[in-house]
């Protein structure tokens, strides 16, 4: 007697095939390497929506909701882009600024997009001094975040900071 496939299993199979078509792949073509993306935000709904959106755009996405979790991931994975909030705790931007510095020390080629609701000109200047490539204020449509990410990926590699 044949095994009956669940509706969820059938949907998952169709969803996987649609994703292949969307990304321009079929069984005969070689898959393109998927750029790695890390989303760091204490709001899990933002991590989830960005993960889903960028996965459909052809990225391999990891998420972290705390600084310590992000540090662990950054220690074992080379990300093309990190999209991060500045306030990973409820009180200060320092966690996010420290993370930018950490990324710059560990992998200067990683592109950093800051996405925060606490964006003043002073905070943006500080984030850029720490090494952020782009600074966006929440709320921002995912399509606009994706345009910024794609622009950074297509731009020339970051030059390492030169000692004074």
Locate predicted features:
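Non-catalytic signal-transmission and effector/linker regions of two-component phosphorelay proteins
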Residues: 1-36, 105, 143-164
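The short loop immediately C-terminal to the conserved phospho-acceptor aspartate in CheY-like receiver
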Residues: 43, 87-91
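Short amphipathic alpha-helix used as the core "switch/output" element in two-component signaling
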Residues: 72, 93-109, 129
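Alpha4 helix (beta4-alpha4-beta5 surface) of REC/receiver domains from two-component response regulators
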Residues: 94-98, 118-136
